[in-house]
Amino acid sequence: MTAAHPVAQLTAEAYPKVKRNPNFKVLDSEDLAYFRSILSNDEILNSQAPEELASFNQDWMKKYRGQSNLILLPNSTDKVSKIMKYCNDKKLAVVPQGGNTDLVGASVPVFDEIVLSLRNMNKVRDFDPVSGTFKCDAGVVMRDAHQFLHDHDHIFPLDLPSRNNCQVGGVVSTNAGGLNFLRYGSLHGNVLGLEVVLPNGEIISNINALRKDNTGYDLKQLFIGAEGTIGVVTGVSIVAAAKPKALNAVFFGIENFDTVQKLFVKAKSELSEILSAFEFMDRGSIECTIEYLKDLPFPLENQHNFYVLIETSGSNKRHDDEKLTAFLKDTTDSKLISEGMMAKDKADFDRLWTWRKSVPTACNSYGGMYKYDMSLQLKDLYSVSAAVTERLNAAGLIGDAPKPVVKSCGYGHVGDGNIHLNIAVREFTKQIEDLLEPFVYEYIASKKGSISAEHGIGFHKKGKLHYTRSDIEIRFMKDIKNHYDPNGILNPYKYI
């Protein structure tokens, strides 16, 4: 990897208390021979040279790195089934992997687990324009799903900054929330059916198109957000929304978070049915993004403590523009905003969204970042970011080099009470980690929040569920894992 993409420390070395499960078999030539008997050369990547497998072993945040020497890239559900049956019989540990854009270390190995990549399962299976039902392989890239549906006057009900890389099966397996949760809700409500390969190779094929089905337990819900710990999602059936005929956005500069909350209340009241996103960013987030984007002109003339991006989508452009123009005038007259800009065309719309979507990549561009994803009541939403920034400043860790922390950045989805806290760093150090944890989790627990709003648990938050979940809930989760995966071979050392 180049200097722009530094190599993370091996997870096994960074976390020496985590030990490889001695019950798991070490891959040998007999295993390779079996996989070569069922897969083509294009479906196997095997090398002793770490750099050749680096993109499969290292996570996007450059924080976790495994030691897998075998990447399997099957192109069918049947092949996934054969792989899982063999691995279960032989007790070979497996990590399912989509686009590897995960943010909690869930999609890369910890030790020498086999990586099962879904990238070759990338076909659209079916689309019904009447019901809006979209069926596809798990490895379809979200960007391609969006483009396919756009060409058929529909949209995928989820959008993420990582849409160019993340895969549909991956976002389902992690229950990603995204930028339009406020309008379209969660994947638990949008996914109609799944095709899943269990650890023993059995296939649950319920990739149906029914909006209603009240016959027994809704098993698909167990696999949405399970992070590949109890089954490998290979196919998805999901409800696509009709493509809006009118899209618009406004970008505001605001001086305090109390005003952000007041603006949200006003937006819900006055924009109501056309409101599709309400995002906020703090000063640190935008400062990082300005430095990262460099040549892209910033939409506002002045710097502010907070910024808000509001998106509207509807079926009548004239109606929507009138509502948004009136809203902009009213917020200006009432002094709720310090400065604002309304998109004039599609190019403006895309540019405004670039300032929000680029924040994670900008924060990660200095060398790495510590990332937290939390749910809180709206009145408490920004308080965790302020508390962490104060803590890092008091320790003298934030500033120009050689200080390790570049900035502490808070941003997120006001509409669903979700804040992302990114600590942009030049290097990962134990001093920073000790200042952040368990402080962040204890703070969230004290506010009755959730330590993971949408990014999941993975390796990063394993063992920390008690900050959000009760003992009985955790026990039930372990029972589910033990039932579906008694040998523990699927995505071990993570989740529960």
From Swiss-Prot:
Record PROSITE patterns: FAD_PCMH (PS51387)
The entry's keywords: Cytoplasm, FAD, Flavoprotein, Isopeptide bond, Oxidoreductase, Ubl conjugation
Origin: domain of life: Eukaryota
Cofactor annotation: FAD
S-S bridge residues: none
Keyword Kinase: no
UniProt EC number: 1.1.99.40, 1.1.2.4
GO cellular-component term (any): cytoplasm
Locations listed in the record: Cytoplasm
Chloroplast recorded as keyword: no
Record Pfam families: FAD-oxidase_C (PF02913), FAD_binding_4 (PF01565)
Residues annotated as domain FAD-binding PCMH-type: 64-243
UniProt GO molecular function: (D)-2-hydroxyglutarate-pyruvate transhydrogenase activity; D-lactate dehydrogenase (cytochrome) activity; FAD binding
Catalytic activity: (R)-lactate + 2 Fe(III)-[cytochrome c] = 2 Fe(II)-[cytochrome c] + pyruvate + 2 H(+); (R)-2-hydroxyglutarate + pyruvate = (R)-lactate + 2-oxoglutarate
Function: Catalyzes the reversible oxidation of (R)-2-hydroxyglutarate to 2-oxoglutarate coupled to reduction of pyruvate to (R)-lactate. Can also use oxaloacetate as electron acceptor instead of pyruvate producing (R)-malate.
Other comment: Present with 13000 molecules/cell in log phase SD medium.
Alphabetized PANTHER family for the sequence: D-2-HYDROXYGLUTARATE DEHYDROGENASE, MITOCHONDRIAL
Protein's recorded name: D-2-hydroxyglutarate--pyruvate transhydrogenase DLD3
Organism: Saccharomyces cerevisiae (strain ATCC 204508 / S288c) (Baker's yeast)
